[in-house]
Amino acid sequence: MNVIKGVVAAPQARVAIAIARFNNFINDSLLGGAVDALERIGQVASENITVVWVPGAYELPLTVKTLVETQKYDAVVALGTVIRGGTAHFEYVAGECSSGLSSVAMASEIPVAFGVLTTESIEQAIERAGTKAGNKGAEAALTALEMVNVINAIKG
């Protein structure tokens, strides 16, 4: 039986991080976790990490698509935070962001990791950005690296 398993170490990987500025008091922690995970656990050199800031989560899919199309990166990590409010705005932004990022990932051969928090409250977002529930930015970064290795192993 042939089993393919990914590892997270990818020292030669070139990784782009697209991050939303809206809710940056939370997203800054996601970014810190992602960069730390890439460098410390994934062994990615800092010069191989590019960070691109965009206004909000809705702008992430187009930005990630553009990054993927440059063919400069082995993986892209999308980071942001969408917090439910009193209107339907949450559903539109969260849904389009998720759908758009998924479409980019499926249309390309480059892993796109989803590190966008979609929470019911600010407290939930803070918990997922490095306190009680870990750091989802770090998790997304490690997912991106593991997928780089899995895809490379599948392609042989």
UniProtKB/Swiss-Prot annotation:
The active site is at residue 89. Its EC number is 2.5.1.78. One of its GO terms (molecular function) is 6,7-dimethyl-8-ribityllumazine synthase activity. It comes from the Bacteria. SUPFAM superfamilies: Lumazine synthase. 5-amino-6-(D-ribitylamino)uracil binds at residues 22, 57-59, 81-83, 114. Transmembrane segments: none annotated. It holds the Pfam family DMRL_synthase. It catalyses: (2S)-2-hydroxy-3-oxobutyl phosphate + 5-amino-6-(D-ribitylamino)uracil = 6,7-dimethyl-8-(1-D-ribityl)lumazine + phosphate + 2 H2O + H(+). (2S)-2-hydroxy-3-oxobutyl phosphate binds at residues 86-87, 128. Pathway: Cofactor biosynthesis; riboflavin biosynthesis; riboflavin from 2-hydroxy-3-oxobutyl phosphate and 5-amino-6-(D-ribitylamino)uracil: step 1/2. Catalyzes the formation of 6,7-dimethyl-8-ribityllumazine by condensation of 5-amino-6-(D-ribitylamino)uracil with 3,4-dihydroxy-2-butanone 4-phosphate. This is the penultimate step in the biosynthesis of riboflavin. This is 6,7-dimethyl-8-ribityllumazine synthase. It comes from Photorhabdus laumondii subsp. laumondii (strain DSM 15139 / CIP 105565 / TT01). The gene is ribH.
